Amino acid sequence: MIKQALISVSDKTGIVDFAKSLSDLGVKLLSTGGTAKLLADAGLPVTEVADYTGFPEMLDGRVKTLHPKVHGGILARRDLPEHMQALEQHDIPTIDLLVVNLYPFVATIAKDDCTLADAIENIDIGGPTMLRSAAKNHRDVTVVVDPADYAVVLDEMKANGNAIGYATNFRLATKVFAHTAQYDGAITNYLTSLTDELQHASRSAYPATLNMAFDKVQDLRYGENPHQSAAFYRDLAAPAGALANYRQLQGKELSYNNIADSDAAWECVKTFDAPACVIIKHANPCGVAVGNDSADAYAKAFQTDPTSAFGGIIAFNREVDEAAAQAVAKQFVEVLIAPSFSDAAKQVFAAKQNVRLLEIALGDGHNAFDLKRVGGGLLVQSLDSKNVQPSELRVVTKRQPSAKEMDDLLFAWRVAKYVKSNAIVFCGNGMTLGVGAGQMSRVDSARIASIKAQNAGLTLAGSAVASDAFFPFRDGLDVVVAAGATCVIQPGGSMRDDEVIAAADEHGIAMILTGVRHFRH
């Protein structure tokens, strides 16, 4: 039964109402500093910890709760007579409920004007110590670190005569250990990122020790293949527009491959300003287009490769309306992603309950890092978010691209970044015409892309081509020109650039170098 609570919080959201409810239930309130003042100003009966322990706060508040009368009351096991006798001997009442959240270290170091001294002063000592004590003794002590749990605790207390069951205490304790681990991880990341220990501003993006925190969203039926087990975790720092923040409106449970492919589709479609549609199969775009609206964009994207689109993942950067829904519903689709779905669109898919509909806010945020596991290690890099500016483009051929060709080239370049290397993408009129992905030879990717267009009945005459990396020889260029391309965009940087540029002039096409490579493995 909860008779006495200690409350000390930095985030004071809802704390007055929570404390009032506890007081109304007959719970004695202990508190510190600013929290105690807030509760007292609200008219609540509260005892300062300094008065409770008989020992004043000291060292500018660095020592408040580090006292046997606090930690003894938290850590004592109620089922051990010797523990209870020790409390009685030293006149230490039990503390049955601990409500603590920590100094805002992460928010502090995010400020541009933060100094190392500021960061150090926002490393909480007493808070984590109390939290860990209470979480360790969770059989007897309820510990709350998240304001979202205030209502849960109150409801259970009211239903059980001020008592909290073991299941709730255990869940709250695990939440505490996760929270303190994340807190210490953030401190470690910060301190080991300093390249000059006297300068907050001098920080490496890659700390000497890297700690990351993820919460499990769900267990998955299996992994990439049925014999592999799997689960999906959400980055606690995920931006609003990230796939992990999806809301599933209907459909079967997402699979490992559904999630991986959905991320590829969503990241690609977000890069377009005009209404766009991206169709993904095995993490590669098999159709991308912009149009007047979602239905128009889908119709154009589907034309690229109707065969591969079967059972694909489809993403839109605009609301899916009834017209778009009716067009998509004619095909077999695994997952459909959009910022929103109209009521009429939802009604269309209500008859296809296996189709997974995901809503995600169309935010600008991206993951801070791109991660790849290797044997015994982790590769960490900044996200490939580079968008070339017109001023960075260099026309290296005698012929300049026309305005239409320039639009097609920039569209193709945007798509190529999301195609597995080696990537060759034919485009025209705001849509992909042929995609060659994942080949060991760039010339093979070029051949496959042209074959794909031929199989789809699409002409490549007058098309634009993007290559994610340079042409090592002229052979790849010869293939795309033979297929009908009249302009090419590529990074350049090959030791044979002059030979490739000369071949472009020989063919009478326009070529642009970006100076940016987009390998994707």
From Swiss-Prot:
InterPro entries: AICAR_Tfase_dup_dom_sf, Cytidine_deaminase-like, MGS-like_dom, MGS-like_dom_sf, PurH-like. Transmembrane segments: none annotated. The keyword NAD does not apply. One of its GO terms (molecular function) is phosphoribosylaminoimidazolecarboxamide formyltransferase activity. PROSITE patterns: MGS (PS51855). It catalyses: (6R)-10-formyltetrahydrofolate + 5-amino-1-(5-phospho-beta-D-ribosyl)imidazole-4-carboxamide = 5-formamido-1-(5-phospho-D-ribosyl)imidazole-4-carboxamide + (6S)-5,6,7,8-tetrahydrofolate; IMP + H2O = 5-formamido-1-(5-phospho-D-ribosyl)imidazole-4-carboxamide. Its EC number is 2.1.2.3, 3.5.4.10. Pathway: Purine metabolism; IMP biosynthesis via de novo pathway; 5-formamido-1-(5-phospho-D-ribosyl)imidazole-4-carboxamide from 5-amino-1-(5-phospho-D-ribosyl)imidazole-4-carboxamide (10-formyl THF route): step 1/1; Purine metabolism; IMP biosynthesis via de novo pathway; IMP from 5-formamido-1-(5-phospho-D-ribosyl)imidazole-4-carboxamide: step 1/1. HAMAP family: PurH. This is Bifunctional purine biosynthesis protein PurH. It comes from Burkholderia ambifaria (strain MC40-6).
